[in-house]
Regions:
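Flavin-dependent oxidoreductase catalytic cores
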Residues: 1-369
Length: 369
């Protein structure tokens, strides 16, 4: 039988994934001073053991001020890289490619964990810190803390932090690096008209608003191995009433990032305004991803609402995505790849899992036939 598209290998640079199922970064908010814990080790090993081809470690802050919450992981010192190296090795040992996303939360930083309010930490709470952003414009809604407008020195420092974190990720054994340029965090805020009111070379027209992203990419490209994938998650659309304009600008910037050494784009939503009218639904970003793939000329991945096996296979088969990012479905069922393989009729579906699981599942199936 023909192998379903979702279960065909995917090669980018010198890295080959066993299938097109990827686990996107999903913050666990369970770190201590940026350090990973046993929770992270078991969590990521379990996702890899479930059969995904790529497992990307959650948004990992490049500096203490870059954390979303006090529970975020970090790579701003060498000691934090020790725990990350254990995670990378565990993911690899269970058959997946270890990836990591490095990030700065910008004006959305200094927040309580989602289950503790999901709002900014109170000004008089010692757990909080000053936030920075391209401009002194708060996000709004539950995140209304006024950020400090960044100076050139701030920009230079943050970009140096990205470089240092990328080096630590490389040395920790990660084979796939994703830059977080999405979701209303710092880089997205530079690109977005909702977060950037600057009048200098980093603001105004789309080219200027994309400058921080291009400079950060170029700086990281210098230190990240040329044979390993360098990717970015980028909000190419906001659903704010100027969708066509934003998407056209985002595609133009994506072309520039591709020319600057970007290997793949993880297509997402901007989340730069609380007033967005997002059309939530199954694989709702698939047409957007397809357009980015076609017009920007590079491989794409995407997530959001892709939990149905048939839909996941179809977006790959139809050329809308090269990889499918499966998030919440993998949290609910880390063996989602196995159940998907069965539903799609993959021959010997048990063997998408490691042998210690697969032989029992296949043996039981044969005996009960």
């Amino acid at each position: 039988m023909t192998t379903p598209a979702l279960f065909t290998p995917f090669t980018l640079k010198d890295v080959t994934l066993r299938n097109r199922i990827a686990v996107p970064p999903m913050c666990q908010y369970s770190a201590v001073d940026g350090f990973t814990t046993d929770w992270h080790l078991s969590h990521y090993a379990g996702l890899a053991r479930g059969g995904a081809g790529l497992v990307i470690v959650e948004a990992t802050a490049v500096s203490p001020e870059g954390r979303i919450s006090p529970g975020d992981t970090g790579l701003w010192n060498d000691e934090q890289a020790v725990g990350m190296a254990r995670i990378a090795e565990a993911i690899k040992a269970d058959g997946a490619v270890p990836g990591i996303q490095i990030a700065h939360a910008g004006r959305k930083a200094s927040a309580n964990r989602p289950w503790e309010g999901d709002d900014h930490i109170a000004e008089d709470d010692p757990r909080g810190w000053e936030t920075i952003s391209p401009s002194a414009v708060p996000f709004g809604a539950n995140l209304n803390k006024m950020p400090k407008a960044m100076t050139q020195a701030d920009i230079d420092r943050v970009q140096a932090d990205f470089v240092a974190a990328a080096i630590r990720a490389r040395d920790a054994g990660f084979q796939w690096l994703e830059l977080h340029f999405a979701h209303g965090y710092l880089a997205q805020s530079f690109f977005s008209v909702h977060g950037n009111t600057r009048a200098d070379g980093y603001g105004g027209n789309a080219a200027n608003r994309g400058r921080f992203l291009l400079e950060t990419l170029a700086a990281v490209r210098e230190v990240w191995p040329a044979n390993l994938p360098l990717t970015a998650r980028f909000g190419v659309i906001e659903y704010d009433g100027r969708d066509e304009e934003t998407l056209a600008e985002a595609i133009e910037l994506t072309r520039a990032m591709r020319e600057g050494g970007l290997d793949m784009l993880n297509v997402s939503v901007g989340f730069s305004t609380p007033n967005a009218q997002i059309p939530w639904g199954s694989a709702f970003l698939a047409p957007v991803s397809e357009r980015v793939r076609r017009e920007a000329g590079l491989p794409v991945a995407s997530s959001w609402g892709i939990d149905d096996p048939v839909a996941a296979n179809r977006v790959v088969e139809d050329g809308q995505m090269d990889l499918v990012m499966v998030g919440r479905a993998m949290l609910a069922n880390p063996h989602w790849p196995y159940q998907t393989a069965m539903k799609l009729g993959l021959e010997r579906p048990s063997w998408v899992l490691p042998a210690p699981y697969a032989h029992w599942l296949e043996r039981y199936r044969v005996q009960s036939a």
